[in-house]
Amino acid sequence: MAKPKRIGKKREKKNIPVGVVHIQASFNNTIITFTDPRGNTISWASSGQSGFKGSRKSTPFAAQVAAEQAARRAQDNGMRTVGIYVKGPGSGRESAMRAINAVGFKVAFIRDITPIPHNGCRPPKRRRV
């Protein structure tokens, strides 16, 4: 006997003209999140979710692809103007911002909110290759 097909509730499109982009660029991955001004997530994408695995996740191209995916989904929800917050030391910072600009968003501001320790935890030892 076949199981009845489950019909889920389809997510409704919100109309949010102004939003905020959070770019979290670590050494291993880049995560891009589009939110409304209150911080509720509209769309998100990451290098790993975009199909890149292993060391290719940390490349600028992977960050660009992820940013384009998240940006298109945010545009479907009516977003036109964004402010950008960038966090982390990763290589995908610049390319993600360029991709968001290329999709057609009007960028209101760009802020770097990378946390800088005031001599907090001891960092990992230097790599010897």
From Swiss-Prot:
Gene this protein is translated from: rpsK
Role this protein plays: Located on the platform of the 30S subunit, it bridges several disparate RNA helices of the 16S rRNA. Forms part of the Shine-Dalgarno cleft in the 70S ribosome.
Matching InterPro entries: Ribosomal_uS11, Ribosomal_uS11_bac-type, Ribosomal_uS11_CS, Ribosomal_uS11_sf
Family to which the UniProt record says this protein belongs: Belongs to the universal ribosomal protein uS11 family.
Name recorded for this polypeptide: Small ribosomal subunit protein uS11
SUPFAM superfamilies for the chain: Translational machinery components
Single biological process term from Gene Ontology: translation
An example Gene Ontology molecular-function term: rRNA binding
NCBIfam families: PRK05309.1, uS11_bact
Keyword field: Ribonucleoprotein, Ribosomal protein, RNA-binding, rRNA-binding
Lineage start: Bacteria, Pseudomonadati, Thermodesulfobacteriota, Desulfovibrionia, Desulfovibrionales
Disulfide bonds: none
Cellular compartments per GO CC: ribonucleoprotein complex; ribosome
Subunit structure: Part of the 30S ribosomal subunit. Interacts with proteins S7 and S18. Binds to IF-3.
